Amino acid sequence: MPKYYCDYCDKYLTHDSPSVRKSHTVGKQHKLAVQLFYQQFEAEFTQSLIEARLKEYEESKGRLIHQPPMGIIPTPYGQMYQQQQQQQQQQGILPFQGMQPPPHQQQGMVLSPGMPIHKMQPHQFNNNNNPHQQHSFQPPHHQHHPHQQHQQHQQHQHQHQHQQQHNQPTIPGL
């Protein structure tokens, strides 16, 4: 009679029958061996993924030097401005206080062709420091604050209950 070999436990069973295999697979040693096998498999698989990612990173490290982020294409205007700034700094020329960088240019950020240029204005704040001053913005009339809606609903229910109490027919003798 052929013997059954358990790959997880690395041993042969006495003989190959369903009852022997079943009693072996429900045993404590077999369950522990199966758990250990899958833990090792998971660890090896995770390590191989980590090594593959590191290899990809090391290979791409030399290719990605000084590339702008996706969607931002360097333009000649931005490059000329940066070169001009570098030359002025090297010559010791300080830019005039009123000089500003081109619109939307912040620390190497360059607009791609076709991007709209908007001059952003600083937010205007009210300087009179009156905390009780009403703001000019009012929400549309059809929108109500949730608390107001709750109050209106309660008032409606109260009116409805009041009407029901007064509209009940009176029974003589009660």
UniProtKB/Swiss-Prot annotation:
Region of interest (Disordered), ranges: 82-174
Function as written in the Swiss-Prot or TrEMBL entry: Component of the spliceosomal U1 snRNP, which is essential for recognition of the pre-mRNA 5' splice-site and the subsequent assembly of the spliceosome. SNRPC/U1-C is directly involved in initial 5' splice-site recognition for both constitutive and regulated alternative splicing. The interaction with the 5' splice-site seems to precede base-pairing between the pre-mRNA and the U1 snRNA. Stimulates commitment or early (E) complex formation by stabilizing the base pairing of the 5' end of the U1 snRNA and the 5' splice-site region.
Keyword Cell inner membrane carried by entry: no
Species annotation: Dictyostelium discoideum (Social amoeba)
ZnF Matrin-type span: 4-36
Family, similarity comment: Belongs to the U1 small nuclear ribonucleoprotein C family.
GO CC terms, sorted: commitment complex; U1 snRNP; U2-type prespliceosome
Protein name in the entry: U1 small nuclear ribonucleoprotein C
Entries under SMART domains matching the protein: ZnF_U1
Top-level taxon of the source organism: Eukaryota
Key words, A-Z: Metal-binding, Nucleus, Ribonucleoprotein, RNA-binding, Zinc, Zinc-finger
Annotated Low complexity bias: 82-109, 122-140, 164-174
A Pfam family: zf-U1
Cellular localization per UniProt: Nucleus
Biological process according to GO: mRNA 5'-splice site recognition; spliceosomal snRNP assembly
Biased composition (Basic residues): 141-163
Keyword RNA-binding among UniProt keywords: yes
Subunit structure and binding partners: Component of the U1 snRNP. The U1 snRNP is composed of the U1 snRNA and the 7 core Sm proteins SNRPB, SNRPD1, SNRPD2, SNRPD3, SNRPE, SNRPF and SNRPG that assemble in a heptameric protein ring on the Sm site of the small nuclear RNA to form the core snRNP, and at least 3 U1 snRNP-specific proteins SNRNP70/U1-70K, SNRPA/U1-A and SNRPC/U1-C. SNRPC/U1-C interacts with U1 snRNA and the 5' splice-site region of the pre-mRNA.
MF-aspect GO terms: mRNA binding; pre-mRNA 5'-splice site binding; U1 snRNA binding; zinc ion binding
